[in-house]
Amino acid sequence: MTKESVESYKKIFKKFLSFEDGKILELMDLDNDFFVDFIVFLREEYKLSDNTLYRQMNFFKTFLNWCNTKSMQTNKDYKKVKLNKYNPDTISLTKEDLKVLENLELSKSKSYHRDLFLIGCYSGQRFSDYSVFERSDVQGNMIIKRSEKTESHSFIPLIPQLKSLLDKHDWNLTIISGQKFNDYLKIICQKAGFDEEVKTTKYMGSKKTVEIKKRWEIITSHTARRTFITIASENLMPDHIIMKITGIQDPKTLQRYKKVNKEKVMDYALNVFS
């Protein structure tokens, strides 16, 4: 189990204890009425969006599935809980953006976090995987890495940009929390001038909220993986190769990662109709 997964379990159970408010509940008490009230509580008390609620309730349901494997009696109503999930407003960076980041003058600490993000952009891995690369993972000109989340093996080409970054830090990458990393990343991307306005949509039950944010505000550690996949796809790398590098096993999942920027749309249109 990844460190991020452990933190996610802690978050939902902290909210559960807050909802429980000292009451003693048994697993059989977690019926449909409980889940209706719990979901309302999470929306009203914590202002969770539908996507965040979907993720956190999945962790809660996974825990109940685990209880079943241990022969504990659970109320099976939890299996009927259905929540909406929407495609999130996400972005990817361009090769030009990566050059801007590479040439940015930063303090030692911010420089490290910038490099760590670029390692993700050039490897296509999840943060939990690209933040723990080791020399022992190298075979020839490949990094062979087993994903912490899926336990599948990825074959990651040790391209010059990636090798240079890893060598720069002597392959000694300090492990930090994803949230702390994201905080640093937003500061770095703001300094890089990623100020273009982006429309974001959040769903909370029947309420739809549209916000205008700066591009740097919605860049996270996961943007690195999405950036690799998008750039690889735009440069005609076959999907099955992208999947082998990233460890993605479902083609539908791969499609959700692909983002097309407006410049590429214009380029293709001009090439077709000029």
Say what each PLM segment does.
Residues W171, I175, D183, F194, ...:
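C-terminal secondary-structure termini that scaffold catalytic or DNA-interacting sites
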Residues M1-E4, F13-D89, N103-L104:
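N-terminal core-binding DNA-recognition domain of tyrosine recombinases/integrases
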Residues D50, Y54, Q73, Y78-F127, ...:
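Basic, Lys/Arg- and aromatic-enriched nucleic-acid-binding interface segment
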Residues S147-E151, T246-N271:
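Catalytic-site neighborhood detector that most strongly recognizes the C-terminal catalytic loop/helix
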Residues W171-N172, K186-K244:
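Short, basic (Lys/Arg/His-rich) helix/loop patches that form interaction surfaces
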Residues V132-V138, S233-N235, M243-Q249, Y257-V260:
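A short, basic/aromatic helix-end/turn motif that makes direct DNA contacts
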Residues P88, S123, V132-L165:
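Conserved tyrosine-mediated DNA breakage-rejoining catalytic core shared by Y-recombinases
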Residues N65-T74, L118-G140:
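Short, charged phosphate-coordinating catalytic segments
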